[in-house]
């Protein structure tokens, strides 16, 4: 096993040096500490062979310098030894010069006695100093004062010495392992991954635990596992990283022989004994059952591998940890591994940082490469492997070379990336491979039930296939709040699927994707055959083509037809004959920019499940009634010439009807009343739509989008089961009765001036922004499920009534007439924004600020930190010196002003850092997204609450900054809170707890200057 010191950035010989007075602690506390440290693999300097003298010798000074941590055990007689005091001075010198970590244990003495050299400790100190010079006395006194201010363990406060010693050992291990090995320094997001996995590992638990790291190929599982190994291996007696297990299967062995072979390789590595030979499968248990081990099993893809190397937890000693990385979640279920960390894709911000770290060796784009970097990040789909490979290939390249790479990435998959991703695909059986390819080409981001219906008449086991693909991390089944499940495949996996099709022999292909090959077939009506089930091609990459009437005659089994345009240049490159014969078995017809005014009269939609004619030239689909029993989804969006919908009486299974941007559509036909399974209706942007049939009861209809239907004045009751109603930018004046409504959005509907007398109590989200509403009804407080309200730009709204306690978000920006709000605003953990509300009266401002004390956030105009914040400072930095009373949280107030040079439209972020005096750890950094600072007309107050996990009595420095420099920080302030008083005040519904604190001085907290007719701060 590698010693803990071997992983440090400096070569330390010992983990710990202990400074102590032998007669006080050697046979008691110190002996117990040594025993615990030995159990945990912590090496501590042993001073028993050193001869004590009047001064500490070179060997002891060297031992102090060669130790990563010094533990000072301050006992009653510690100061009676000049040796101990000289040790202490040397230790503090090493702390200052070398960054040595110093920990303290107060063993039977009060820290204040040590600090002031009083009591029995002071008597011993004075006796020692009586024989010394004043210079030595001052030197020792200063050292004792410094060490007493280092937070440590106070023996008198512990009821159980053993538990205290266990905690000390854990603290030592945490400090030894405070950061990963330098191999992973600067790796974006690695700390967050390690923090989550360490939580699952529960390292203080003596049970043996198996934890998995799961995710798709290229997500970074192995990298995370290696960083974890570097971070934790020194905590264990034995450790081993077993890599590339995927390639460990040898066909020359039977199952027993394979497991035996794998165990031999494993034990040879973990025990550092090359060429081990074993004769039975109990060898791991025989060798490791009494050892605390850390084992990483990387890239596991067979259950046999787990059965061979970690079949039972009893094979390993107490406290052992086994970490498995895999793409196969089903394998984890089969082996009974329930503790799994699922590696997710990085955020947009982190993905850009990852790319830049490889392309520029920094975390942000070089000047002039900002847009190109964002384009590459998007094309890589935020997959860390893709960002790494592509970023490295771009290092040192010029802008025009970057542009070439961006163009190539749109259609071509890098070979190194393909090699990694293809492994998972090739491990699938034929059924799963077929389904994978169909999803990659036709059904990415489609509804799961819809896809199952697509294959209802085939032999393909879609339900089982989807489960396999999800378990292998090749797709993700994304579940939405309304219960819908969509199939999501990563963009690079899609490209890999296309490459897999291109590598097939022409006569083997069930799916055609080569645009030139397909156009040749359609133009000359020859080639292909019975086995072709799908066709998908990009018409933006071809010249003009005229399709023959019998083009699909040789493809009788064609079920999936997709014609799309990756670049919409407005040109119609395809010419379709009026009487073209579509395949009669079509289940998917997805044709973007269809060039004809209608579908051919011979078109038979009997088997059709989805009809998608986005941006078509259609004026109508067909005449008369058609058999539509299988149709579940119809999308005619952006068909600007569409004047009428067909008779939909037979579409009794239709669930989704999308008509966005159908600008010529005037009326929804009455046949829609037969669509009893319709769940969603979307007519956004139908600017000429005037009529929606009345007297309908579409019992399945839950979501209705009517935004931008500027001529629509009346909305009938379409269903009493509507949950989500969006009627933005319309001419409507009222809302139909929907007793189960959850979301109501009438933003931008200027004719809408009043709410229903009784809003449904089921409402969770309400958007009234940019309406002429003047009053909100008193029933508002009874909406106990309401979570979010948007009143932005309601310029006539003068007051806010009592709000429900369930409210989490209230946006009232630019409410120019708003003066009063109901007091108090007792809403726990709520975020309130009153940007540019310059008419707020004194009581309203007081209520808004007070609300933030309930673990909330607030934004409102202001030039100075209000007097209620008892710690205030000019500029961006604030130091707080706790008064000794326990606190659990702070409320911060920051005065910001928009940087006039900023022209960004992306909401900037406020970064704040907590730095504790003499703390060896890293500062705590927290990002707070602060909204549209670029819209603030003057200075504003940003108020937010933050909890601390533990009380600390040392000085704390808080620093606030804007990484993007989009705003300036004028002032900052903070108020220390005790959790009990906040909780009691919230539960009582009063503001009594703040009466003494929230005393606003108008001359200080509120300015008297005028901004036009508005009082500003």
UniProtKB/Swiss-Prot annotation:
Residues 191-447 form the NB-ARC domain. TIR-NB-LRR receptor-like protein that confers resistance to the pathogen Leptosphaeria maculans (blackleg disease). The keyword Transit peptide does not apply. It is an enzyme of class 3 (hydrolase). One of its GO terms (biological process) is defense response to fungus. The lineage of its organism: Eukaryota, Viridiplantae, Streptophyta, Embryophyta, Tracheophyta. Disruption phenotype: No visible phenotype under normal growth conditions, but mutant plants are susceptible to the pathogen Leptosphaeria maculans. LRR repeats lie at residues 539-562, 583-605, 606-628, 629-652, 654-675, 676-698, 699-724, 738-760, 761-782, 784-809. InterPro entries: AAA+_ATPase, Apaf_helical, Disease_R_plants, Leu-rich_rpt_3, LRR_dom_sf, NB-ARC, P-loop_NTPase, TIR_dom. Its EC number is 3.2.2.6. This is Disease resistance protein RML1B. It catalyses: NAD(+) + H2O = ADP-D-ribose + nicotinamide + H(+). Keywords: ATP-binding, Hydrolase, Leucine-rich repeat, NAD, Nucleotide-binding, Plant defense, Repeat. The gene is RLM1B. GO terms for molecular function: ADP binding; ATP binding; ATP hydrolysis activity; NAD+ nucleosidase activity, cyclic ADP-ribose generating. The active site is at 87. It comes from Arabidopsis thaliana. Residues 12-176 form the TIR domain. The TIR domain mediates NAD(+) hydrolase (NADase) activity. Self-association of TIR domains is required for NADase activity.
């Amino acid at each position: 096993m590698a010693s803990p010191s071997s992983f440090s950035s400096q070569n330390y010989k010992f983990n710990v040096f202990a400074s102590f007075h032998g007669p006080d602690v050697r046979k008691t506390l110190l002996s117990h500490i040594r025993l615990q440290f030995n159990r945990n693999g912590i090496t501590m300097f042993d001073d028993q062979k050193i001869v004590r003298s009047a001064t500490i010798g070179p060997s002891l000074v060297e031992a102090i310098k060669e130790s990563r941590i010094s533990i000072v055990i301050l006992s009653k007689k510690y100061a009676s030894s000049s040796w101990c005091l000289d040790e202490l001075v040397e230790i503090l010198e090493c702390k200052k010069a070398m960054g040595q970590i110093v920990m303290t244990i107060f063993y039977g003495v009060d820290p204040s006695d040590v600090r002031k050299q009083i009591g029995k400790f002071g008597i011993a100190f004075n006796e020692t100093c009586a024989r010394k010079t004043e210079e030595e006395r001052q030197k020792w006194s200063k050292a004792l004062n410094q060490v007493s201010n280092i937070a440590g363990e106070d023996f008198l406060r512990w009821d159980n010495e053993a538990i205290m010693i266990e905690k000390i050992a854990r603290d030592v291990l945490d400090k030894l392992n405070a950061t990963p090995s330098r191999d992973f320094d600067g790796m974006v997001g690695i700390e967050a991954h390690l923090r989550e996995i360490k939580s699952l590992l529960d390292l203080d638990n003596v049970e043996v635990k198996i934890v998995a790291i799961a995710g798709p190929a290229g997500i970074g599982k192995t990298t995370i596992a290696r960083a974890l190994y570097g971070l934790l291996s020194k905590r264990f007696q034995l450790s081993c990283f077993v890599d590339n297990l995927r390639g460990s299967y040898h066909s020359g062995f039977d199952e027993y022989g394979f497991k035996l072979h794998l165990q031999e390789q494993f034990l040879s590595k973990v025990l550092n004994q090359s060429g081990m030979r074993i004769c039975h499968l109990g060898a791991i248990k025989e060798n490791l059952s009494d050892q605390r081990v850390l084992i990483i099993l990387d890239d596991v893809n067979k259950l046999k591998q787990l059965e061979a190397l970690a079949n039972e937890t009893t094979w390993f000693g107490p406290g052992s940890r086994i970490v498995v990385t895999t793409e196969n979640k089903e394998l984890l279920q089969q082996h009974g591994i329930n503790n799994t960390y699922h590696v997710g894709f990085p955020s947009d911000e982190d993905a850009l940082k990852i790319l830049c770290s490889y392309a520029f060796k920094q975390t942000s784009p070089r000047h002039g490469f900002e847009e190109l970097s964002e384009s590459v990040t998007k094309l890589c789909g935020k997959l860390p492997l893709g960002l790494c490979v592509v970023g490295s290939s771009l290092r040192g390249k010029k802008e025009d070379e970057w542009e070439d790479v961006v163009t190539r990435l749109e259609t071509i998959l890098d070979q190194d990336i393909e090699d990694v991703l293809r492994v998972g695909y090739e491990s699938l059986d034929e059924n799963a491979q077929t389904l994978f390819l169909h999803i990659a080409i036709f059904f990415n981001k489609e509804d799961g039930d819809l896809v199952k219906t697509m294959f209802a008449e085939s032999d393909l086991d879609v339900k089982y296939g989807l489960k396999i693909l999800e378990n292998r991390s090749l797709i993700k089944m994304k579940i939405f709040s309304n219960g819908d499940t969509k199939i999501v495949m990563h963009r690079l996996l899609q490209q890999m699927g296309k490459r897999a099709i291109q590598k097939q022999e022409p006569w083997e292909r069930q799916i055609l994707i080569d645009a030139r090959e397909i156009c040749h077939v359609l133009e000359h009506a020859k080639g292909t055959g019975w086995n072709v089930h799908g066709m998908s091609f990009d018409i933006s990459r071809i010249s003009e083509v005229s399709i023959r009437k019998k083009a699909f005659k040789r493809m009788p089994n064609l079920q999936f037809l997709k014609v799309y345009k990756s670049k919409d240049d407005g040109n119609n490159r395809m010419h379709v004959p009026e009487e073209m014969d579509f395949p009669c078995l079509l289940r998917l017809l997805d044709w973007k920019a269809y060039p004809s005014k209608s579908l051919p009269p011979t078109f038979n939609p009997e088997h059709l499940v989805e009809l998608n004619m986005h941006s078509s030239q259609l004026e109508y689909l067909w005449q008369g009634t058609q058999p539509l029993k299988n149709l579940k989804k119809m999308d005619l969006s952006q068909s600007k010439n569409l004047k009428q919908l067909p008779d939909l009486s037979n579409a009794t299974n239709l669930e989704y009807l999308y008509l966005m941007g159908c600008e010529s559509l005037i009326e929804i036909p009455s046949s829609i009343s037969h669509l009893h399974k319709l769940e969603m209706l979307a007519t956004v942007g139908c600017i000429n739509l005037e009529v929606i049939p009345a007297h309908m009861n579409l019992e399945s209809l839950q979501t209705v989008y009517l935004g931008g239907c500027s001529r629509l004045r009346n909305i009938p009751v379409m269903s009493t089961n509507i949950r989500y109603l969006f009627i933005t930018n319309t001419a409507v004046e009222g809302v139909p009765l929907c007793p189960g409504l959850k979301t109501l959005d009438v933003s931008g509907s200027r004719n809408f001036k009043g709410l229903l007398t009784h809003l449904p109590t089921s409402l969770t989200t309400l958007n009234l922004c940019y309406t002429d509403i003047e009053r909100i009804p008193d029933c508002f407080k009874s909406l106990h499920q309401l979570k979010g309200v948007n009143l932005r730009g309601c310029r006539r709204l003068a007051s806010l009534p009592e709000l429900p306690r369930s409210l989490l978000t209230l946006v009232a920006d630019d409410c120019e007439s708003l003066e009063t709000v109901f007091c108090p605003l007792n809403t726990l953990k709520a975020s309130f924004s009153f940007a540019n509300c310059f008419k707020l009266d004194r009581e309203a401002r007081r209520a808004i600020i007070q609300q933030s004390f309930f673990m909330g956030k607030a934004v409102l105009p202001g030039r100075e930190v209000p007097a209620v914040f008892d710690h205030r400072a000019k500029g961006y930095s604030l130091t707080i010196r706790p008064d000794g009373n326990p606190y659990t949280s702070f409320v911060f107030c920051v005065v910001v002003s928009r940087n006039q040079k900023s022209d960004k439209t992306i909401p900037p972020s406020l970064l704040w850092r907590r730095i504790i005096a003499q703390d060896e750890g890293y500062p705590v950094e927290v990002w707070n997204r602060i909204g549209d600072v670029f819209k603030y007309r003057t200075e504003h107050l940003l108020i937010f609450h933050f909890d601390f996990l533990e009380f600390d009595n040392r000085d704390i420095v808080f620093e606030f900054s804007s990484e993007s420099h989009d705003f300036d920080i004028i002032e900052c302030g903070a108020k220390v809170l005790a959790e009990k008083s906040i909780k009691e005040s919230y539960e009582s519904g009063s503001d009594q707890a703040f009466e003494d604190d929230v005393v606003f001085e108008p001359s200080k907290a509120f300015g008297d200057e005028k901004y036009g007719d508005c009082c500003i701060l």
